[in-house]
Design a protein with these regions (language model features):
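Alpha/beta enzyme core
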Residues: 1-229
Length: 229
């Protein structure tokens, strides 16, 4: 299996430039948000901008036609099959895709269409493990699993889920390795209590204390007052 480190960012391009400089050896893709481009010319321009900033590949969940336009210009593209959030209404919402044979065939066909369009890989999201493994074994491209099992070439999770940095539901296919949201809640209480203590000290004249003050010696202070008379 591939040992590949991929970070996918749908960020403003100047934000990515800073990230690229901080992680020069990491293979990075930058996503073109769905609907951002309305023509092949626009999607090529967006892809070129992303590569110019130092990205290794472009993520795009739009049509094979748009993707082919980019790959013809030698832009490495990663597509998306299975449960694609931007087009989830067509597959029944946020749920697994491919649990019956007709859906599984469509995932296979979608993967092949993207392969024919020239992608270097696809993100395969919420597809049954056996289906994902079969497609992986019968494809020439990199299959990146998002909840589609160990049989794919690489694994992908959102950092927010790995860190549990949000209070929302963690999906079944994800695994948390920390609980930053819990720690942040504690930190926010500490910050709140500190601000309340500061306000109380000011109101009761406990702050500032002598150790917080800057002093002038009596002789210099007298000179200061005399000079103003």
């Amino acid at each position: 299996k591939l040992n590949i480190s991929i970070s996918n960012f749908e960020l403003k391009l100047f934000d990515f430039y800073s990230i690229r400089n901080a992680a020069k050896k990491t293979f990075m893709t930058v996503g073109i948000p769905y609907g951002h481009c309305s023509s092949e010319k626009e999607v090529i321009k967006a892809g070129m901008q992303i590569l110019k900033l130092g990205a290794d590949a472009v993520y795009c969940s739009m049509s094979p036609e748009f993707i082919k336009a980019m790959t013809k210009e030698k832009i490495p593209v990663i597509g998306h099959v299975g449960m694609v959030p931007a087009t989830k209404s067509w597959t029944g919402g946020f749920k697994a895709v491919g649990k019956n044979s007709s859906e599984a065939i469509k995932v296979y066909d979608d993967t092949k269409r993207l392969e024919d369009a020239g992608v270097i890989g696809v993100e395969m999201e919420l597809v049954p493990t056996k289906v994902a493994e079969y497609i992986t074994n019968n494809s020439e491209i990199i299959i990146i699993s998002m909840g589609s099992g160990k049989g794919c070439d690489a694994q992908y999770l959102f950092a927010e889920d790995i860190f549990a940095s949000h209070p929302d539901h963690i999906p079944r296919h994800a695994k948390t390795y920390a609980n930053i949201n819990k720690e942040m809640t504690k930190i926010e209480k500490i910050k709140h209590d500190a601000l309340v203590s500061f306000i109380n000290d000011v109101n009761s004249q406990k702050f500032p204390e002598d150790k917080n003050l800057i002093f002038i010696n009596d002789n210099e202070y007298s000179k200061f007052i005399d000079s103003l008379k």
